[in-house]
């Protein structure tokens, strides 16, 4: 088990504007503080990902997303009920409450409450994190720390070692408004 000191150390890196890699439910992810524009733009540059595409935010509890979920129609909240924590990412209207470097050209943002124990502990200390697969655009997502280090040699501020969550595929992505599956699991 990863010690609390290591979780705290990686959380300090995130709060200081660092870009980190960490295991998720299915693949390795890279992330940073979503409120730190410089960190997000650096992460996007590492991945060669255009800002217009938008990013996923992960959290350890639904409450970390309350500022985005309050005032939503009850039928939408019913769709979320029972799907978090877990491998379910929802496109939620952001209503101008998030910066464009997170949302890209979209009127919604992708949100997931993780069930990965290590990432939950990290998000408990940092708040929500940007979470995107650890790979340059067009390359397969990293499934090992070695592959992360090959993709991003000496470009990350911390690599939070741990085991993947055992899922075969990244999370399903659904639109909260329609319930439509955007990306199957």
Curated annotation (Swiss-Prot):
Annotated compartments = Cytoplasm
Q: Which family does it belong to?
A: Belongs to the SUA5 family. TsaC subfamily.
Q: What keywords were assigned to this record? A: ATP-binding, Cytoplasm, Nucleotide-binding, Nucleotidyltransferase, Transferase, tRNA processing
Q: Which PROSITE patterns match?
A: YRDC (PS51163)
GO MF term list: ATP binding; double-stranded RNA binding; L-threonylcarbamoyladenylate synthase; tRNA binding
User: Gene Ontology terms, cellular component aspect?
Assistant: cytoplasm
Q: What is the lineage of its organism?
A: Bacteria, Pseudomonadati, Pseudomonadota, Gammaproteobacteria, Pseudomonadales
User: What is the E.C. number?
Assistant: 2.7.7.87
Q: What is the official name of this protein in its record?
A: Threonylcarbamoyl-AMP synthase
| Example GO biological process | regulation of translational fidelity
Cysteines engaged in disulfide bonds, as pairs: none
State if Cytoplasm is listed as a keyword.
yes
């Amino acid at each position: 088990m990863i010690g609390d000191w290591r979780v705290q150390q990686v959380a300090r890196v995130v709060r200081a504007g660092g870009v980190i890699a960490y295991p998720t439910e299915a693949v390795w992810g890279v992330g940073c503080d979503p409120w730190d524009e410089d960190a997000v733009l650096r992460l996007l540059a590492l991945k060669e990902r255009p800002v217009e595409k938008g990013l996923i935010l992960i959290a350890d509890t639904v409450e970390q997303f309350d500022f985005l979920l309050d005032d939503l129609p009850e039928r939408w909240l019913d769709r979320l009920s029972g799907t978090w924590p877990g491998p379910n990412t929802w496109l939620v209207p952001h209503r101008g409450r998030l910066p464009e470097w997170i949302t890209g050209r979209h009127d919604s943002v992708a949100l997931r409450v993780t069930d990965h124990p290590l990432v939950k502990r990290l998000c408990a200390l940092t708040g929500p994190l940007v979470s995107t697969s650890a790979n340059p655009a067009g390359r397969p997502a990293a499934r090992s720390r070695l592959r992360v280090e090959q993709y991003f040699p000496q470009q990350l501020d911390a690599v939070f070692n741990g085991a993947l969550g055992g899922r075969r595929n990244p999370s399903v992505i659904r639109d909260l408004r329609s319930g439509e599956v955007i990306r199957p699991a």
